[in-house]
């Protein structure tokens, strides 16, 4: 039976060469497009999947009627400490702020992403110092920053970037360390990192916060508890504000 079907198929292919070629080509193109679509979907759904305990890392977000119900991930810096102090299921709360800046390196202007963050975010993102010191993590009036391996190779080639100056919009910073960070296939790429300089008050709502929950945490229950126990500083902004968390992967 199979042999007979193959004979008929081959006979039709030979007899209807043009139609067969068009059909085979269409099938091949469709298969390639389908495969590329599957690859793209998989790629888009696996951002930051490589991080340790990625299934327990969430981004804090707000949603209030004052802004017509729009969801925002911009929150106050002080909310991080509040979350870890009042909700035992939250193991880590790491505030950070990524901003694209026009910088000058060796008198050449380039675009770079600067990360304002503390040690909690560095630990959560597994950012390691491979050369230099931790001075870039010192508190206020800090004029030192760290550069990633990739950025160091891009802008300084074979030169040692330690001690070099980087001119930013408002400040001149000195590089004191080189860090290793996974900047591929992530939502949080950066070129430089330094201690937070932005306002840390409740009214300066321009930070992002990543939290890491403890194993077996009921996320819906945690969200309900957070909304039922919002800090007074957030309630004063709007009585309709709601706070939640969403998976980063």
Residue positions per predicted region:
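Mid-to-C-terminal secondary-structure elements
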Residues: 118-134, 143-249
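N-terminal Sec/SRP start-transfer signal
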Residues: 1-31
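Alpha-helical transmembrane segments
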Residues: 29-58
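Extracytoplasmic
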Residues: 55, 88, 109, 140-142, ...
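Residues that recognize and position ribonucleotide moieties
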Residues: 73, 115, 145
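Glycine-rich loop motifs involved in handling phospho/adenylate chemistry
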Residues: 25-29, 135-140
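Short amphipathic beta-strand/extended segments in non-transmembrane regions
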Residues: 58-62, 76-131, 233
